[in-house]
């Protein structure tokens, strides 16, 4: 396990209900060579399944989403592990190295196969806490006292006790984990959330919710 700083997510912190500036990444790693393989994709996914089921999660709620990973001069196939729409872990199978003119293209860069191949997993501790509590935002799950204190100091009601507001916030957090905001606008995301809970997009107008949280 290691603490991580997420500078790429700074603009989303506090807005999405699911992003943090720092988090604790739990993991297991395997360094395989062509001469000696310890384990690779099948066992990595099986270990993840066993963990999720051992924690009591519904197997029908688990989705593995393929999305190639690249960074630091290496790359490889990866699986984003989603439970109920919330990403809990990423399983990276790093077997490529950046090479000019390489035959494999990932995210605009050229790669070739490496002699070794590495299992590099990451399990977000705070995400697991959030999933276990079922709270509308990750902040309510891991900083409940702080959220209440800030709300008191700001003189606002903590409207997550309102069932409608809590459901809308929860749907937003779940769908935000599955929607690429580089491809979809906030209006499109709002329309998806409204459709999923059977209300009109107009009811999700930001002005309406600013009034709901006024003192």
Feature names for model-found ranges:
Residues 1-215:
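Structured aminoacyl-transfer and RNA-binding surfaces used for tRNA recognition/handling
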């Amino acid at each position: 396990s290691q603490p991580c700083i997420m500078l790429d997510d700074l603009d989303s912190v506090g807005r999405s209900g699911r992003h943090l500036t720092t988090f604790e990444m739990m993991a297991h790693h395997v360094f395989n060579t062509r001469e000696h393989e310890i384990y690779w994709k099948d066992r990595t996914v099986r270990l993840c399944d066993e963990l999720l089921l051992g924690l009591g999660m519904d197997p029908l709620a688990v989705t593995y989403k393929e999305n190639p990973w690249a960074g630091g001069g290496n790359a490889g196939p990866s699986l984003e592990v989603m439970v109920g729409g919330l990403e809990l872990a990423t399983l990276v199978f790093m077997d490529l190295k950046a090479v000019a003119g390489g035959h494999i293209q990932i995210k605009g860069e050229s790669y070739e196969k490496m002699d070794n191949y590495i299992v590099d997993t990451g399990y977000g501790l705070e995400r697991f806490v959030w999933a276990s509590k079922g709270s509308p935002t990750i902040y309510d799950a891991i900083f409940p006292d702080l959220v209440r204190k800030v709300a008191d100091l700001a003189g606002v009601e903590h409207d997550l006790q309102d069932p409608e507001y809590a459901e809308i916030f929860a749907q937003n957090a779940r769908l935000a984990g599955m929607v690429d905001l580089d491809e979809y606008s906030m209006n499109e995301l709002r329309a998806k959330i409204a459709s999923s809970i059977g209300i009109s997009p107009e009811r999700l107008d930001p002005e309406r919710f600013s009034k709901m949280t006024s003192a």
